[in-house]
């Protein structure tokens, strides 16, 4: 193989990898329907928008909320996790995720920032989104949560929050 051909092939591969990396960096992750459901749910729950938050709960999680949360409200459960001295929610963003069950579920970590005291380190939230038929983009439902704690605390990472049965604020 001629040297120029080898250089062209290597250049093409490097350019292709660079293009893929650039597109992954530029495309917002919450364009994935599961990630969008997770961030939208977190925002709605933290802002007290009960109807929006409850609309994306799985039937099993909705039953858990009805039985275990004050007034059977998901926003009351989640609002109870957040100290008043953190202030108002600034925003929630997607942080990372792990694909599960052959694409029918995602274990997702979102990151919330608050007006006072929890801006830089933030609040780490774990959510599991499931969709029995992934081809249906509207079918994603929240089936579990944990966290809603400062990212400064020990064991607040995605792996700990999704696998530890004693994770803080877990449901169910």
Predicted feature locations:
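Alpha-helix initiation/capping motif
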Residues: 27-30, 62, 66
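Short, well-ordered alpha-helical segments enriched in acidic and aromatic residues
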Residues: 49-65
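Short, solvent-exposed helix-to-loop capping segments enriched in aromatics
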Residues: 71-95
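Exposed beta-sheet edge and beta->alpha loop/turn motif
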Residues: 86-172
């Amino acid at each position: 193989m001629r040297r120029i051909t080898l250089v062209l092939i290597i250049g093409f591969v490097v350019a292709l990898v660079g293009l893929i990396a650039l597109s992954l960096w530029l495309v917002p992750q919450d364009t994935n329907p599961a990630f969008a459901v997770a961030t939208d749910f977190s925002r709605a729950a933290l802002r007290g928008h009960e109807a929006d938050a409850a609309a994306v709960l799985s039937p099993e999680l909705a039953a858990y909320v009805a039985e275990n949360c004050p007034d059977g409200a998901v926003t009351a459960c989640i609002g109870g996790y957040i100290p008043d001295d953190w202030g108002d929610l600034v925003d929630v963003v997607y942080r990372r995720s792990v694909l599960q069950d052959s694409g029918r579920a995602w274990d997702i970590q979102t990151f919330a920032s608050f007006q006072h005291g929890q801006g830089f380190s933030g609040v780490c939230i774990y959510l599991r989104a499931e969709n029995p038929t992934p081809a249906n983009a509207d079918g994603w439902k929240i089936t579990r949560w944990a966290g809603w704690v400062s990212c400064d605390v020990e064991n607040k990472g995605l792996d700990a929050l999704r696998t530890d049965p004693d994770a803080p604020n877990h449901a169910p």
